């Protein structure tokens, strides 16, 4: 049951109150948004229409690009609009919707990145069983599991917020609706809920990151017996994936693996994984992957 509340809308402080800085942020975030959406859509189109990119790795990469496109579209347009004027109001329902979608996509991406590491583990450590293990049916099931995990995670987070009474103030010291800034506005003791947030968000991030790290340790040990060319190709693919993992996981662990309090650096960290990481992902995968670059060139010639 929802807790009683007097608050019908929130006001976001954003990243800066300086009009000149706001104009600079508008141009910067508009450029980042266009590059992010354009780059990720280009990867989706390239994988969809390129017969040479039919392996499970690219199947998962297309879904990662789709999630990053949605993630950027969930966060950045509101931030761009808020940079143009001082009124940064968002309805209570709109705040919860943004919060739910962000955690849905974030939770799904965390699990999908772990699935992609498992795909690389099977391809490198058990190559003879790769085609029989990573069938199209298995890939679809793994993507479905990632989405289901994201739904369960975001639903649990939303349930925690709905238990909070909001009686005022209603000014969020952030540029997005997230748990810790909302916990600060609740007119009740939030210690227990803060621990549940750490258990739900922080532990999930940490456990998945540890599984990813363990899989790459096994992969690196296996690569010692491969040829120099085989090591180079595998390290190129795995290096791109691990870079994406580090860019997404490290900020998330920093934010959620600590008590429910906000730090001055939290906004900068949030900009990194909410706004910049979805832009970096397509750049990392295309610049370090010859197959993707060649497929893009072939599509361009057509």
UniProtKB/Swiss-Prot annotation:
<feature type="topological domain" description="Extracellular">
    <location>
        <begin position="258"/>
        <end position="266"/>
    </location>
</feature>
<feature type="transmembrane region" description="Helical; Name=5">
    <location>
        <begin position="192"/>
        <end position="212"/>
    </location>
</feature>
<feature type="topological domain" description="Cytoplasmic">
    <location>
        <begin position="288"/>
        <end position="302"/>
    </location>
</feature>
<dbReference type="GO" id="GO:0005886">
    <property type="term" value="C:plasma membrane"/>
</dbReference>
<dbReference type="InterPro" id="IPR000276">
    <property type="entry name" value="GPCR_Rhodpsn"/>
</dbReference>
<keyword id="KW-0716">Sensory transduction</keyword>
<dbReference type="GO" id="GO:0004930">
    <property type="term" value="F:G protein-coupled receptor activity"/>
</dbReference>
<feature type="topological domain" description="Cytoplasmic">
    <location>
        <begin position="213"/>
        <end position="236"/>
    </location>
</feature>
<feature type="topological domain" description="Extracellular">
    <location>
        <begin position="161"/>
        <end position="191"/>
    </location>
</feature>
<feature type="transmembrane region" description="Helical; Name=6">
    <location>
        <begin position="237"/>
        <end position="257"/>
    </location>
</feature>
<dbReference type="InterPro" id="IPR050427">
    <property type="entry name" value="Olfactory_Receptors"/>
</dbReference>
<keyword id="KW-1015">Disulfide bond</keyword>
<comment type="function">
    <text>Odorant receptor.</text>
</comment>
<feature type="transmembrane region" description="Helical; Name=2">
    <location>
        <begin position="47"/>
        <end position="67"/>
    </location>
</feature>
<keyword id="KW-0472">Membrane</keyword>
<feature type="topological domain" description="Cytoplasmic">
    <location>
        <begin position="117"/>
        <end position="139"/>
    </location>
</feature>
<protein>
    <recommendedName>
        <fullName>Olfactory receptor 4C3D</fullName>
    </recommendedName>
</protein>
<dbReference type="GO" id="GO:0007186">
    <property type="term" value="P:G protein-coupled receptor signaling pathway"/>
</dbReference>
<keyword id="KW-0325">Glycoprotein</keyword>
<comment type="similarity">
    <text>Belongs to the G-protein coupled receptor 1 family.</text>
</comment>
<keyword id="KW-0675">Receptor</keyword>
<dbReference type="GO" id="GO:0016020">
    <property type="term" value="C:membrane"/>
</dbReference>
<feature type="topological domain" description="Extracellular">
    <location>
        <begin position="68"/>
        <end position="95"/>
    </location>
</feature>
<feature type="disulfide bond">
    <location>
        <begin position="95"/>
        <end position="187"/>
    </location>
</feature>
<feature type="topological domain" description="Extracellular">
    <location>
        <begin position="1"/>
        <end position="24"/>
    </location>
</feature>
<feature type="transmembrane region" description="Helical; Name=3">
    <location>
        <begin position="96"/>
        <end position="116"/>
    </location>
</feature>
<dbReference type="InterPro" id="IPR017452">
    <property type="entry name" value="GPCR_Rhodpsn_7TM"/>
</dbReference>
<keyword id="KW-0552">Olfaction</keyword>
<dbReference type="InterPro" id="IPR000725">
    <property type="entry name" value="Olfact_rcpt"/>
</dbReference>
<keyword id="KW-0297">G-protein coupled receptor</keyword>
<dbReference type="GO" id="GO:0004984">
    <property type="term" value="F:olfactory receptor activity"/>
</dbReference>
<dbReference type="GO" id="GO:0007608">
    <property type="term" value="P:sensory perception of smell"/>
</dbReference>
<feature type="transmembrane region" description="Helical; Name=1">
    <location>
        <begin position="25"/>
        <end position="45"/>
    </location>
</feature>
<feature type="glycosylation site" description="N-linked (GlcNAc...) asparagine">
    <location>
        <position position="6"/>
    </location>
</feature>
<feature type="topological domain" description="Cytoplasmic">
    <location>
        <position position="46"/>
    </location>
</feature>
<keyword id="KW-1133">Transmembrane helix</keyword>
<dbReference type="Pfam" id="PF13853">
    <property type="entry name" value="7tm_4"/>
</dbReference>
<feature type="transmembrane region" description="Helical; Name=4">
    <location>
        <begin position="140"/>
        <end position="160"/>
    </location>
</feature>
<keyword id="KW-1003">Cell membrane</keyword>
<keyword id="KW-0812">Transmembrane</keyword>
<keyword id="KW-0807">Transducer</keyword>
<feature type="transmembrane region" description="Helical; Name=7">
    <location>
        <begin position="267"/>
        <end position="287"/>
    </location>
</feature>
